[in-house]
């Protein structure tokens, strides 16, 4: 039985693939940029091109793998995310897939917008098992532009979160939870809100980076509109997506993210990583 990992080059999927490889668990990576030089067996898969959706099921046999029985679902980079994902879930079910692990978000309830619609659809299917992973904000987002560039070149983190606190979580821990959910059957229909071990404001994150990098890093908090405009102008993010991201950041000010739980250790047996440890390991990115 083979696991299909979608979003193959993403933060969680790439880490999940490494864990599956280490465990010698049969898997296939689905990616729009799949090539023969990939480190793992892979297949073309593009959410925006339906003619690629069946290729992983065809390629599994060509790669000498068994039938695909489980899928790690990472959605496409579009606003209306649910229709193509639900259509693909139906295709996969017709191919014999029995379990789905969905990457959603802590702020998206079952039945809510985007991934929440996919979550609700999976829950409505009597014959499949699923786990919805609902992680909070990724620590590793600071390793990518525009945040990386702001920290490296401007000595600042720019958000619209004010002094609101977030239980930042590492993509390593999300991947570890996904690994256990995909390889240890029996969870049936459930969800895990995946949180880090501590609550941090971006001001506190800046203080940690100041200590680790040996230079003063500040947190600059903008208005919702100000951040959206900056993301469009400096990062080239589409206006509608930038507006959504900015609204999510402003919501942090009201404290809905200020919670902790034990999901990571309960599922994996290991405690989640602290931001200071991730930052110390990755500090070369901001040097």
Curated annotation (Swiss-Prot):
GO molecular function, one term: oxidoreductase activity
Keywords annotated in UniProt: Alkaloid metabolism, NAD, Oxidoreductase
Disulfide linkage: none
Source taxon at top rank: Eukaryota
Family: Belongs to the fgaFS/easG family.
Pathway: Alkaloid biosynthesis; ergot alkaloid biosynthesis
Entry's Gene Ontology BP terms: indole alkaloid biosynthetic process
Name this protein carries in UniProt: Festuclavine synthase II
EC numbers on record: 1.5.1.44
Its job: Festuclavine synthase; part of the gene cluster that mediates the biosynthesis of isofumigaclavines, fungal ergot alkaloids. The tryptophan dimethylallyltransferase ifgA catalyzes the first step of ergot alkaloid biosynthesis by condensing dimethylallyl diphosphate (DMAP) and tryptophan to form 4-dimethylallyl-L-tryptophan. The second step is catalyzed by the methyltransferase ifgB that methylates 4-dimethylallyl-L-tryptophan in the presence of S-adenosyl-L-methionine, resulting in the formation of N-methyl-dimethylallyl-L-tryptophan.
Phylogenetic lineage: Eukaryota, Fungi, Dikarya, Ascomycota, Pezizomycotina
The keyword Thylakoid belongs to this UniProt entry's keyword annotation: no
UniProt KW Transcription regulation keyword: no
Reactions accelerated catalytically: festuclavine + NAD(+) = 6,8-dimethyl-6,7-didehydroergoline + NADH + H(+)
Gene3D superfamilies: NAD(P)-binding Rossmann-like Domain, UDP-galactose 4-epimerase, domain 1
